[in-house]
Amino acid sequence: MGLMSTRACTGVNSGRMPVNPTKIRLSILRQAGKDQESHWEVFEVPFREKMNVISALIEIQRNPVTKDGQTVKPPAWEAACLEEVCGACTMNINGGIRQACTALIEEVGKPNGDAYEVTLEPMKKFPLIRDLVVDRTKMFENLKKVQGWVPIDGSFDLGMAQPQDDHIRQFRYSLSRCMTCGCCLEACPQVNEKSSFVGPAAIGQALLFNLHPVGKALEGDRLEFLTGEEGITGCGNAQNCIKVCPKSIPLTRAIAELNRDTTKYRLKKWMGAV
């Protein structure tokens, strides 16, 4: 009943009878390559309840004809898990960064007469490959910079894991949910062409492994990196990262804790205790 009421309200136009949208009008920013000119193409596909943006893109892929009747190459886009786990389908949808697989048309579309209007653009903080596909390599390169792994130099008996405080374990779990989708980098004003800041995702992973009983072996190396130009000082505390993170990762808390840890590390290093 609530859904019907919402549609009725959004469908009212100057006293006319309310109109339930029957189609989706997608405006897609297209670009054949990073050195090519970009342009907009508009497609219309039939609307079905509970459709997501990926479903609409699949409809276009099956019949790549624009609203004006022109047959074109199907727009390029990425998807894998379709359950908001891989991050491959991340794009700007009606001006907001999120995953296309969980973006329901009823939620993100703007009702306009008999159509839901949806605008799709690629992420702007990553090199463009084609249309809605970008190269997220720098996220994985940043993980290398913070040494986002547990160092293992041989084979060991499994045995019992080292006990860990339950609060730390729960915090580590929240940090481990990162899927390197790029939402936080896209929303962060400090991540730009003029800055070398590694971004919130890599910093969160640095803390994740610093809190690991074995990963802690590389804590000094990670803190040393984070005290440099690419690290903690690059954060401007805009807090956009936690607003857009699809996994609600406490990124600002991670940055704050590492800010404390790097300060203690530098003081100890200055006093020769490191």
What are these regions (language model features)?
Residues 40-52:
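Short, contiguous acidic and Ser/Thr-rich linear segments
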Residues 1-19:
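N-terminal mitochondrial targeting presequence
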Residues 86-139:
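A generic, well-ordered mixed alpha/beta core segment in the N-terminal half of proteins
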Residues 51-73, 116-274:
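Ferredoxin-type iron-sulfur electron-transfer modules in oxidoreductases and energy-metabolism complexes
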Residues 26, 86-89, 100, 178-181, ...:
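Short, thiol/selenol-centered motifs that function as redox-active sites or metal-ligating centers
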Residues 21-43:
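Eukaryote-biased recognition of intrinsically disordered, low-complexity regulatory segments
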Residues 60-96:
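A basic, amphipathic helix-loop patch mediating RNA/tRNA/ribosome contacts
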